[in-house]
Amino acid sequence: MNSKVFAVLLLLALLTCVLSEKYCPTPRNTSCKKMNIRNNCCRDSDCTSNAFCCAEPCGNFCHKASDKPGGRRVDPNASCQTGYVYW
């Protein structure tokens, strides 16, 4: 009996973790002129209020987490500098 209760509790814990996953929102812009690329962040710790640093066509920006996948979080190990990006 105890093993069944444990299994149910474990399953509920796993389900809670999966359902509480947060993502970067889908970017509004799908393209960007190279002269307008600006990084406001390079990692999540650059953002306030537990926002995510999300990669977009015009640079990296902080966004509130979304329940729906569609955006892409910035790789914290990638080479990045905040400010305007010049090619």
UniProtKB/Swiss-Prot annotation:
Q: Where is the WAP domain?
A: 21-66
Keywords for this entry? Antibiotic, Antimicrobial, Disulfide bond, Secreted, Signal, Toxin
Give yes or no: UniProt keyword Signal. Answer: yes
Family the entry assigns: Belongs to the venom protein 11 family. 01 (wap-1) subfamily.
Q: Whose protein is this, by species?
A: Lycosa singoriensis (Wolf spider)
* Source species, domain of life: Eukaryota
Q: Name one GO molecular function term.
A: toxin activity
Post-translational changes noted in the entry: Contains 5 disulfide bonds.
What compartments host this protein? Answer: Secreted
Q: GO CC: one term?
A: extracellular region
Secretion signal: which residues? 1-20
Q: Which GO terms describe its biological process?
A: defense response to bacterium
Function noted in UniProt: Has antibacterial activity.
Expressed, tissue-wise, as follows: Expressed by the venom gland.
Q: Where primarily located?
A: secreted
Q: Which InterPro entries match?
A: Elafin-like_sf (IPR036645)
Q: List the disulfide bonds.
A: 24-54, 32-58, 41-53, 42-80, 47-62
| This protein's name | U14-lycotoxin-Ls1a
